[in-house]
Design a protein with these regions (language model features):
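Acidic-basic catalytic patches of nuclease active cores, encompassing PD-(D/E)XK
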Residues: 1-32, 83
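Structural signal for conserved beta-strand scaffold positions within catalytic alpha/beta enzyme cores
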Residues: 30, 55, 91-93
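Short acidic/glycine-enriched loop/turn segments that link adjacent beta-strands
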Residues: 35-38
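Short polar/acidic secondary-structure junctions
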Residues: 33, 46-47
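Conserved catalytic cores of phosphodiester-cleaving nucleases, focusing on short active-site segments
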Residues: 20, 41-43, 49-60
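Short, charged, amphipathic alpha-helix that recurs within catalytic cores of restriction-modification
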Residues: 64-91, 98, 103, 113
Length: 176
């Protein structure tokens, strides 16, 4: 199962890099696996002075998580490149077209709409205490998880250079 998750993550990161590199003045690079201590992707637009540090998550469940150490990596790179007037931390979430869950000790997959969200997480840099985990749900809501509590975290959508408009999704409560 671990290899499937790793390859799914790599494929998502690779696809994001390709989309960014095909978007005019943007240049993006995948920086390697989690053991590198770097964000998944760094993208720059030198013409407009924009730097994006991107942490990408993909999965077949209803919730995707970004741990604190991965947020810290994005903050370090974002702060290192102060020459860029516009620097953003982007949390990219891709919810696969099939939902995975357990039923009677079996793994079952159910078709659903594939959704992607790009959340601006710049507000995290001003927090005195970083959340242990950032959580994103299938409907695009984000939460900060601290030691003893979960709080709503309204991270705004980021319009990626390859998007025509930000994703606005309405999901009936019965599917959640």
């Amino acid at each position: 199962m671990g290899n499937i998750r790793r390859s799914r993550g790599y494929n998502y990161e690779h696809a994001l890099v390709q989309k960014l590199n095909s978007s005019g003045s943007w240049r993006a690079r995948r920086l390697g696996g989690s053991s590198t201590g770097l964000p998944d992707i760094v993208a720059v637009n030198n013409d407009d002075g924009v730097l994006l540090t991107i942490e990408a998550k993909s999965g077949a469940s209803d919730i995707l998580y970004v741990p604190q150490d991965q947020i810290e990596r994005c903050l370090v790179i974002r702060n290192m490149f102060a020459i860029y007037p516009k620097r953003h931390i982007i949390l990219a979430f891709k919810f696969m077209g099939k939902k995975r869950f357990r039923r009677k000790n079996e793994t079952v997959y159910e078709s659903r709409k594939l959704l992607e969200y790009y959340k601006v997480a710049d507000a995290l840099s001003s927090m005195k205490v970083l959340p242990i985990i950032i959580k994103c749900t299938y409907d695009g809501r984000t939460y900060a998880i601290y030691k003893r509590k979960t709080v709503s975290l309204d991270l705004p959508e980021y319009l990626m250079p390859f998007q025509k408009s930000a994703v606005q999704v309405s999901i009936p409560q019965e599917t959640m």
